[in-house]
Amino acid sequence: MKLSLSPPPYADAPVVVLISGLGGSGSYWLPQLAVLDQEYQVVCYDQRGTGNNPDTLAEDYSIAQMAAELHQALVAAGIERYAVVGHALGALVGMQLALDYPASVTVLVSVNGWLRINAHTRRCFQVREQLLHSGGAQAWVEALPLFLYPADWMAARAPRLEAEDALALAHFQGKNNLLRRLNALKRADFSHHADRIRCPVQIICASDDLLVPTACSSELHAALPDSQKMVMRYGGHACNVTDPETFNALLLNGLASLLHHREAAL
């Protein structure tokens, strides 16, 4: 699996791995790259079955497989210890990595994540699946911003959204791969295992997230032994895109604090 690695800003700089959500594209993290590159070696990638890592995914594709293939790719690149920043599905992959490779994951940042899918989130995905089946990729892509962004943010950026729609259609991961990745997301359940995650965790959520209620992050916070929760008042599900200034400040401060906390505990 292909990875994109930034040059380390200094010798032995900590590594931060960015894992996007269901869309799978590493470019989702573009608003974070410039600030992270100054302090960390940053790893981005298109998830298997998407972008520049095309593949046909098995029907039983799982979050555990997503975690294993990423860890194997990191080890092949010479990276054995790393912090993880995951958004939604990416946060699930991050938790799986922390469970399966505890010696490798130094810190986990969960952005609008959850222990197991909430009934409201499931309903949103059911509606989106119906759109996919009835209207194809175009209907799926055109509906996506409604679940990602605040209304006023979208209203002020109509040309940008049109350009994003065209790009998403051109690089659509395919119906079968999308549904198999979505099914993996829906099957994931960390409610009985989260207390085994020992690395420090920063939880970031947005109070106006239409797709994932903030209660999901509260449940995560209660279940994880060593976690802190930060709530953004604005930004929607893709809060790192819509309000990068606020998000980046939370992320940089959180990573610095938790990595120091981790080193002090060793």
Swiss-Prot record:
Keywords: Hydrolase. Pfam families: Abhydrolase_1. It catalyses: carbamate + 2 H(+) = NH4(+) + CO2. Disulfide bonds: none annotated. GO terms for cellular component: membrane. Gene3D superfamilies: alpha/beta hydrolase (3.40.50.1820). The keyword Hydrolase applies. GO terms for molecular function: hydrolase activity, acting on carbon-nitrogen (but not peptide) bonds, in linear amides. One of its GO terms (biological process) is nitrogen utilization. Its EC number is 3.5.1.-. It comes from the Bacteria. The keyword Transmembrane does not apply. Involved in pyrimidine catabolism. May facilitate the hydrolysis of carbamate, a reaction that can also occur spontaneously. Belongs to the AB hydrolase superfamily. Hydrolase RutD family. This is Putative carbamate hydrolase RutD. It comes from Escherichia coli O127:H6 (strain E2348/69 / EPEC). The lineage of its organism: Bacteria, Pseudomonadati, Pseudomonadota, Gammaproteobacteria, Enterobacterales. The gene is rutD.
